[in-house]
């Protein structure tokens, strides 16, 4: 009978022959509910930790800058064309102001000869000293030099705007990141803060 009982042992007696202790197996069901109850908190805490590990710079690296694909909007030819058009408008404005000063009866006597010299042609008897002062002035820069100056100013302005945009974007992302971390922490404390801490094996 003893041999038959020995041969008819079920699998329940196998842990006795295994190197693992049976106490460890009996404690496993008791710790399972605690670990299951703490699993949502652990998952939320892990999500918060992973979110806290990220920084606004990570989002900036993931999302390309909106200035990356923007090429130069104004070419050198367009800048030169705009300068020519602006120069023509300035000349027309000066002629209009000169004609208004010439036809205005309330203008002073010393401004009338100046207006005449600007708008009207010089009389044959006048000397070269009484010619228009605009004809005496020599241009300091050529048209190409003015275009290069304008192009450089536009590039400097574009870089300044880009730096200001990146700075504002970093500030806004940092504020959103802090608000998200605070919101996640408040949610964790509100949901699991009142529960007693349990040992998780």
Swiss-Prot record:
Subcellular compartments: Nucleus; Cytoplasm; Membrane
Keywords: Adaptive immunity, Cytoplasm, Developmental protein, Immunity, Innate immunity, Membrane, Nucleus, Phosphoprotein, Protein transport, Repressor, Transcription, Transcription regulation, Transport, Ubl conjugation
Motif residue range(s): Nuclear localization signal: 22-27
Location of the motif SYVS motif: 198-201
Superkingdom classification of source: Eukaryota
Record GO biological process: adaptive immune response; cerebral cortex development; defense response to bacterium; embryo development ending in birth or egg hatching; innate immune response; negative regulation of DNA-templated transcription; negative regulation of gene expression; negative regulation of transcription by RNA polymerase II
Gene Ontology cellular component annotations, sorted alphabetically: chromatin; cytoplasm; membrane; nucleus; transcription repressor complex
InterPro entries (alphabetical): Akirin
Tissue specificity comment: Highly expressed in testis, cerebrum and cerebellum, and barely detectable in liver, heart, spleen and muscle. Also highly expressed in various tumor cells from hepatoma, glioblastoma and pheochromocytoma.
A GO MF label: enzyme binding
Effect of residue 103 to A: Abolishes binding to YWHAB. Loss of transcriptional repressor activity
Modified residues (Phosphoserine): 18, 21, 55
KW Transcription (keyword) present: yes
Coarse class of the protein's main subcellular location: nucleus
CDD domains noted in UniProt: akirin-2
Post-translational modification: Polyubiquitinated. Polyubiquitination is dependent of UBR5 that extends pre-ubiquitinated AKIRIN2.
Family the entry assigns: Belongs to the akirin family.
Function, in words: Molecular adapter that acts as a bridge between a variety of multiprotein complexes, and which is involved in embryonic development, immunity, myogenesis and brain development. Plays a key role in nuclear protein degradation by promoting import of proteasomes into the nucleus: directly binds to fully assembled 20S proteasomes at one end and to nuclear import receptor IPO9 at the other end, bridging them together and mediating the import of pre-assembled proteasome complexes through the nuclear pore.
Assembly behavior: Homodimer. Interacts with IPO9; the interaction is direct. Associates with 20S and 26S proteasomes. Interacts with SMARCD1; promoting SWI/SNF complex recruitment. Interacts with NFKBIZ. Interacts with YWHAB.
Entries under PANTHER family matching the protein: AKIRIN-2, AKIRIN-RELATED
Protein name: Akirin-2
Organism: Rattus norvegicus (Rat)
Gene that encodes it: Akirin2
């Amino acid at each position: 009978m003893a041999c038959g009982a020995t041969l008819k042992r079920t699998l329940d007696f196998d842990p006795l022959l295994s190197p693992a202790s049976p106490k460890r197996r009996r404690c496993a069901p008791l710790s399972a509910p605690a670990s299951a109850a703490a699993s949502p908190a652990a998952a939320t805490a892990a999500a918060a930790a992973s979110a806290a590990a990220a920084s606004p710079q990570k989002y900036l690296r993931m999302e390309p800058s909106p200035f990356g694909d923007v090429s130069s909007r104004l070419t050198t030819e367009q800048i030169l064309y705009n300068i020519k058009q602006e120069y023509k408008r300035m000349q027309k404005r000066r002629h209009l102001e000169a004609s208004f000063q010439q036809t205005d009866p309330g203008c002073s006597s010393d401004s009338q000869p100046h207006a005449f010299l600007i708008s009207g042609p010089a009389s044959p008897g006048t000397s070269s000293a009484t010619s228009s002062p605009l004809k005496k002035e020599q241009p300091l820069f050529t048209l190409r030099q003015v275009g290069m100056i304008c192009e450089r100013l536009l590039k400097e302005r574009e870089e300044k705007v880009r730096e200001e945009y990146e700075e504002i974007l970093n500030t806004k992302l940092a504020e959103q990141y802090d608000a998200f971390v605070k919101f996640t922490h408040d949610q964790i404390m509100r949901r699991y803060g009142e529960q007693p801490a349990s040992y998780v094996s």
